[in-house]
């Protein structure tokens, strides 16, 4: 279908799940097909992420407004993108990068660029009358990802005393994605009952997981395992656990301080070795601070052949940083967040680089989300087999899970559930 071009670009300011402004873009094509995309924002931001453009006017949304970005899209950027061929995603993304002209997208903002990039892809898929996952991945796109479900929130994602950001359940023993969500929902609601019985609060954090004040991390593991078993499931067989440590948030002066303890890098790695032995933990995300290169090499050497060691802040969806990690044996898995890099093309390139070098890939949301479900489609398109998109409460999280349930139905008998990581 040749010569379907971008006819109009319209941006507006909306609110994300934390009540902060973000961008929504609508692309209208020359055949009158249109599509919208909206952009998330993170609470824990890696030092090397592409830069969001914010207004920084403290009298307007406390400085978090995005009217500058919206105005740029509706004027300068839009004028240069209109009339480009919709089906040439790479050309459009390269044009957006060129318009910005910086190495970190700080002039027009990664949020501006990504909103356009994703909306273009959605419009192209609609033009061809196929789902986005099929447009991006073709007929080989058929693996439904195992969800890493953030069942208890801590760190910067919750107003409680837990140091680690996310305590996750991983339903690798399910027979289908639908089965995985059902099993996880049962554990989620059982966990709520257990927390109430122990007189912990059951308020939820930014990503929909419970946010109780539990002093000891090991008690959190014990409570989650209790919820799994009381739901009729077995650890290791049906569920295992994952952690997003976000170690950079408590790393200072070459020391790690949490739970009233101060650790050297070596001591922290020993701590991880101990809990991985004691508990069914099969995935550690950002267990080491992004600048602690020796620590990353150490933990990968000690645990990399046993569990998944995930780099988020270490890699920030950036091919250059991923290659550096591969060359230096740091981590064995890459977390992918499109807004860390700013275009769909760069996101897909980062995924391909990781997969080519046998690094596992996990598609991920951000703490400040919208109801946009693009990451669900990307996860299936690239057959990465894993997705992180929060807990089983808050509609912006469930939107992604519900979209994957829909994709599984579309794929019908072709659908394959990833299962074990």
UniProtKB/Swiss-Prot annotation:
Pathway(s) per entry: Carbohydrate degradation; glycolysis; pyruvate from D-glyceraldehyde 3-phosphate: step 4/5
PROSITE patterns: ENOLASE
Catalytic residue positions: 207, 337
Entry GO CC: cell surface; extracellular region; phosphopyruvate hydratase complex
Keyword tags: Cytoplasm, Glycolysis, Lyase, Magnesium, Metal-binding, Secreted
UniProt-listed GO biological process terms: glycolytic process
InterPro entries recorded: Enolase, Enolase-like_C_sf, Enolase-like_N, Enolase_C, Enolase_CS, Enolase_N
Swiss-Prot/TrEMBL cofactor(s): Mg(2+)
Chief localisation class: cytoplasm
Family: Belongs to the enolase family.
The protein's name: Enolase
Species in which this protein is naturally found: Ehrlichia ruminantium (strain Gardel)
Gene name per UniProt: eno
